[in-house]
Amino acid sequence: MTTRSDFDRSLETWLADVRPTSPPGWLLDQTRERLAETDRRSQWLIPDRWTWNANARRVVAGGRIVLVAAVLLLIVLAALAAVVLVGAPRPAPPFGLTTAGYITLDSADGIVVARIDGSDRHVLVPPDGQSISPIWSRDGLHLAFWHRARTVGPWSLVVVGRDGAARHVIAEGVTLREREESLNQPSSITWSPDSQRMAYAADTPAGSAIFVGDIEGGATAITDPKLKGIDPAWAPDGTSIVFVSETSTTLHSVAPDGTGEHQLATLKDIVLWPDWSPDGASLAVSAAVDDQLDVFTVSADGTTVTNVSHDPSAEFSPSWSPDGSRLAWARAPADESARAWVVVSDRAGTRIVELRVPADLAPPVWSPDGTRLYSYVMDDAERFYQLLVLDPEGVAPPVRIQADGNVGNGSWQRLP
């Protein structure tokens, strides 16, 4: 072990080498004092450190208070940041754009994905045959659509991933009704809330039936073809599927495994396109009254049916906003030379805005963030459908999106 006298001698030698003309005595004295202080402190026991000096106790206590205050301040600032970033309302993106996802269309180029302003346009499913009615799963990770190799013949239900890969054939040899092959009809496919299954209507030799398919492949009929089930809509809680029976123009409900089928509500004449409110409390449907299509809401248990449109024009294809506060539907005037409209109302049917658009209107579709609507309109000059973007508040004018060739049914993708 090196002694203090050894250290003194070593320090003297070093100072002599470095500064031979400077007397080292003053530095030796200062160094001895510091070593002595260090030696005294090395003899402290941990419990004794807080009793060695009254001033030290005050300093330590004050330091503790400052530390606690700093921690509390950080917690408060973190909470305020969370409120600002999560809870505060965010400004909507510029009209015609959305950060909520991409719009997906069936077109002459195959199934195309693009931003609503037409940018970042790319082909998700190549035009190898015919692909129609694309619809995104609720988590935005999978796209289902109908496909066939030629322009005639049976269809296959196909699912792909967000990038168009991981292709699964859910069902083959499916015969769709002519109405469901139309450009201006809602998709006949409905996703389960967990995005693992889908329901659809297909013709069988005995009549139309509702089928449920698994995302990995395979499908099973869950309704009696004698009911001629069409237009399935999967409930938000996943426990039931509502569909329309063409046999009796009634709404029916059935569990996804085919059990518990029962009549939910009876409406007059034609019933079409049921759509669940996001909270599962009610459905919106199109139904004919005195040969006139109107929009109705139906309570989840079928006990309350309310006409929310009350208009002499044909009003159809209702669609709930993502937050369930509004309904949008299409209105076709009796006079074919007149313009069509998209109507936006609250849940009670009180009209918020009526958006005038060109004729041959297709069903309106909400963006996932509820800030936009889109529909298809027939271009009078070119005679093919194009995309029309609408502001549901009626403030900004409609924006027509030019498309290459015909466009048909589409879906708005929610980004995961």
Which ranges hold each PLM region?
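A short, acidic loop/turn at secondary-structure junctions
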Residues: 1-33, 38-45
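N-terminal membrane-targeting/anchoring modules of bacterial envelope and secretion proteins
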Residues: 33-35, 51-54, 93-95, 101
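Short alpha-helical segments used as structural interaction elements across diverse proteins
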Residues: 16, 29-31, 55, 60-61, ...
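Short linear capping/connector segments at secondary-structure termini
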Residues: 47-52, 172-175
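Internal signal-anchor transmembrane helix that establishes type II topology
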Residues: 51-82
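Intrinsic-disorder/low-complexity, polar/charged segments
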Residues: 5, 60-64, 69, 204, ...
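Sequence signature of WD/YWTD-type beta-propeller architectures
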Residues: 6, 12-14, 23, 76-416
